[in-house]
């Protein structure tokens, strides 16, 4: 539909004035601006990358990863840091919980020598550091662990029995208002790790669970990932890891509510090889005959753990099967459901 010529002139004049005051590009016609593809940082999990729809977590956005204790929240975040560093990214870890295991991070592939780490005393200090490094323009990814540990200064300075209603929620709301635009401008990804709490006096319908830090983060986050431990992995009666399910409960860059399941092995993190086998079997790329798993004419091993061990050693073969899986799923990146039952017994 054609726009009136007088209106066009008025709009053009207004755009010029806005450009003078706020800088070029402050207001643009969408048709004049090329729509850029959303860049992403891999999560280190094939299934979760597919579930997110763009191959990982989006750059320049706020991400929330939440779930119960020992569900894999920090492990997933450390994998994202490792993937970002592999592509030359600079990463920071704001350890508000003062609980970062450097040796574990290194085993997950994190370049700990070049990882920026802060262990702030208060929530205000943590968020000031976050804002400063983001505004520098030199950082690609920041992880805050965790929202629950961002304790307001007034609460730290007060007595144990003092009531500080809504202080943390106001702190988060204020910080997110300030930093959202900066993150987009600097193309910096911000990941908040969060814990869950039970709603007091919850009656009737709805989930009794909620996340800490108020409602602001729920609104500002472009992606929210709920991660849960769903089973224990055992080998010869020995507990060797956990099976985790990650659900994308909010996604502003692709369809939400997709899920992914993966193994988190103790001391190793997310098992990429396990996902390759799961998706390979589901898509008939990997053959399963009894307990034996094979790819084309090559035997991968008897049992899932043996096949995983072979793929861990043969990176070229693992990459080849991964490529076949991605091609099979297709360019629309529709997530394929995982097997209804694990390939080996779990508890």
Swiss-Prot record:
Keyword DNA-binding attached: yes
Subcellular location per the Swiss-Prot or TrEMBL entry: Cytoplasm
Assigned GO CC terms: cytosol
Residues that hold ATP according to the record: 67-74
GO molecular function list: ATP binding; ATP hydrolysis activity; ATP-dependent DNA damage sensor activity; damaged DNA binding; single-stranded DNA binding
Gene Ontology BP annotations: DNA recombination; DNA repair; SOS response
This protein's record includes keyword Plastid: no
Keywords (A to Z) from UniProt: ATP-binding, Cytoplasm, DNA damage, DNA recombination, DNA repair, DNA-binding, Nucleotide-binding, SOS response
Main location: cytoplasm
Job description of the protein: Can catalyze the hydrolysis of ATP in the presence of single-stranded DNA, the ATP-dependent uptake of single-stranded DNA by duplex DNA, and the ATP-dependent hybridization of homologous single-stranded DNAs. It interacts with LexA causing its activation and leading to its autocatalytic cleavage.
NCBIfam families, alphabetized: tigrfam_recA (TIGR02012)
Family: Belongs to the RecA family.
Protein name: Protein RecA
């Amino acid at each position: 539909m054609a726009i009136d010529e007088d209106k066009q002139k008025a709009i053009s004049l207004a755009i010029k004035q806005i450009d003078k005051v706020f800088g070029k590009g402050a207001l643009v016609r969408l048709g004049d601006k090329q729509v850029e593809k959303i860049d992403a940082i891999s999560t280190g999990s094939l299934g979760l990358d597919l579930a997110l729809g763009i191959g990982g977590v989006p750059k320049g956005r706020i991400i929330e990863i939440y779930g119960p204790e020992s569900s894999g929240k920090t492990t997933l975040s450390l994998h994202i840091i490792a993937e970002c560093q592999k592509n030359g990214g600079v990463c920071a870890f704001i350890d508000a919980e003062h609980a970062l295991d450097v040796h574990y991070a290194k085993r997950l592939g994190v370049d700990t020598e070049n990882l920026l780490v802060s262990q702030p005393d208060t929530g205000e200090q943590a968020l000031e550091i976050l804002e400063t490094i983001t505004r520098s323009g030199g950082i690609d990814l920041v992880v805050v662990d965790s929202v629950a540990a961002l304790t307001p200064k007034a609460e730290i300075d007060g007595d144990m029995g003092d009531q500080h209603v809504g202080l943390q929620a106001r702190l988060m709301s204020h910080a997110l208002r300030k930093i959202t635009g900066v993150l987009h401008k600097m193309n910096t990804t911000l990941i908040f790790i969060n814990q869950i709490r039970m709603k007091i006096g919850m009656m009737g319908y709805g989930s009794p669970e909620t996340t800490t830090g108020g409602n602001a983060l729920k609104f500002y986050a472009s992606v929210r990932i709920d991660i849960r431990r769903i089973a224990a992995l055992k080998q010869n009666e020995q507990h060797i890891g956990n099976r985790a399910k990650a659900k994308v409960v909010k996604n502003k860059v692709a369809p939400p509510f997709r899920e992914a399941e993966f193994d988190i092995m103790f001391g190793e993190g997310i098992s990429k090889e396990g996902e390759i086998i799961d998706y390979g079997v589901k898509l008939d790329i990997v053959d399963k005959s009894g307990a034996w798993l094979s790819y084309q004419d090559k035997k991968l091993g008897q049992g899932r753990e043996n096949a995983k061990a072979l793929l861990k050693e043969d990176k070229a073969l693992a990459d080849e099967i991964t490529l076949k899986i991605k091609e099979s799923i297709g360019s629309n990146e529709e997530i394929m459901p995982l097997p209804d039952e694990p390939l080996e017994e779990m508890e």
